[in-house]
Amino acid sequence: MLEFKHKNTFFLFNFKQPKAQQACFFRSSFWKKQARILGSAQGRGVTWFLQTKDLFGVNAALKHYYRGGLWGKINRDYYRFSTLSNARSFAEFSLLKQLHEAGLAVPKPLGACVEKVAFGFYRADLLTEKIEHAQDLTVYLQQGKLTEQDWHKVGQLIHQLHSLQVCHTDLNAHNILVQQRDDGRKFWLIDFDKCAHQLGERWKSENLNRLHRSFMKEVTRMKIQFSEQDWQALLAGYQA
């Protein structure tokens, strides 16, 4: 782990030895100048996919934190600063590191930065591993079906997360990736912003219900191939 401050910006990296121009790693313009942009994905903001295997051993995804909802139209990306560990990017980095080291299929965190701005606010960015040959599960389900064994895998993945007492507060069908591999399909969980450890058991069934509602919503909205039989297969994997 490498942690340092440069001017008004705090940096955290998942490596020990400093790298050239590392303070520039959270600027998309830096990667564009080096012709390292592999592509992008549009969500609340743009996530940039970067060619970084020579630097990190894996390609990377760079995201800037943006606010959503009505408040996001007034204040796009400023957050009230309390402590560095509670800043959005540092908190997500820390949780991802714990989950990755526990063997959960989540992107490896590569770096985080927090830029303090005026009046006690900050802006934040996160670098994570790019999951290769993967796509949003809902996009996949627009084109084809998963097998019963695949749904078991999804359920097992969520159970593994819950067994670590971690609640994914935005557990939905879009935050599951399906990766095509030579040995079959592998499933990943992404987007752990604002997620945290949680005590007790009741929240786990509520979390699963949230996911079920998400699938049902996309049956109507995106015409994905998903049935109650698929959901029961997911639950069987979760309970196995």
UniProtKB/Swiss-Prot annotation:
Gene Ontology CC terms, in alphabetical order: plasma membrane
EC class of the enzyme, as a word: transferase
UniProt entry keywords in alphabetical sequence: ATP-binding, Cell inner membrane, Cell membrane, Kinase, Lipopolysaccharide biosynthesis, Membrane, Nucleotide-binding, Transferase
Residues annotated as catalytic: D170
SUPFAM superfamilies for the chain: Protein kinase-like (PK-like) (SSF56112)
Pathway listed: Bacterial outer membrane biogenesis; LPS core biosynthesis
EC number: 2.7.1.166
Keyword Metal-binding: no
Localisation: Cell inner membrane
Molecular-function annotations in GO: ATP binding; kinase activity; phosphotransferase activity, alcohol group as acceptor
NCBIfam families given in the database record: PRK01723.1 (NF002475)
HAMAP family given in the database record: KDO_kinase (MF_00521)
Protein's recorded name: 3-deoxy-D-manno-octulosonic acid kinase
Organism: Pasteurella multocida (strain Pm70)
